[in-house]
Amino acid sequence: MASHPIVHTDIPATDPKAAGAFYAAVFDWQIQTDPTFDYTMFQAEGGPAGGFTLIGRDEDAVPYHYRAGEVLIYIGTDDIDNSLRKVAAHGGEVVLAKTEIPDVGWWAVFRDPSGNRIGLFTSVPRG
């Protein structure tokens, strides 16, 4: 059986850098900004990494629109295409098709039968 752990979490924020400062002060999370993607990332001890993504970004600028109150978890998968086929076969809906993150991997977003939006992620093979 394949492993499908939660590998990443996106927390929407009106000001990602301020959100990072808040969580660092309250929970001692390690915060780092990736200038390549203008993305503020966090690492919580003992948990998966994540990031603070800007609410209300221009829909044309990013392939997925984040909303306040919708924390998005990402499930790791070795085969996003196969996972999306299974989602559709079992009553889910693909919201964002497989999309490349250059030099990082691929991601996608689906809606489960209860209406929850969940992300999928596959890393670029390292060799």
What are these regions (language model features)?
Residues 13-15:
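Conserved beta-strand-loop-alpha-helix junction that forms the acyl-donor binding cleft
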Residues 117:
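Glycine-rich acetyl-CoA-binding "A-motif" of GNAT/NAT acetyltransferases
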